[in-house]
Amino acid sequence: MSEPTPVNDDEEAFAESTLTQAIENQIESNNPPAAQATLNKLTLVGYERGDILNLMAHVLATEIDAMLAENRAFDTQWYETALRALPELPPEKP
């Protein structure tokens, strides 16, 4: 088994930026509706927008990692449930 390739800072910044933009697009298009609902909920309880986007991006990254590892389609139901559970982060998938 090969060792994972280390991620450099530029790649990490690009991934973070891309995930954040994906979340912004979901909020703007209200698709899935859980994206806007999560933003509203966390804003009401005092979270800053940047922190909310980071939490939501973490959930998106978790699902994308699982999707790629398991060679399956994106699980929209899991994703929406995990968004609605924020600020509690989902458990890391094996």
Q: At which residue positions do the language-model features occur?
A:
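Structure-specific DNA junction-binding interface
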Residues: M1-P94
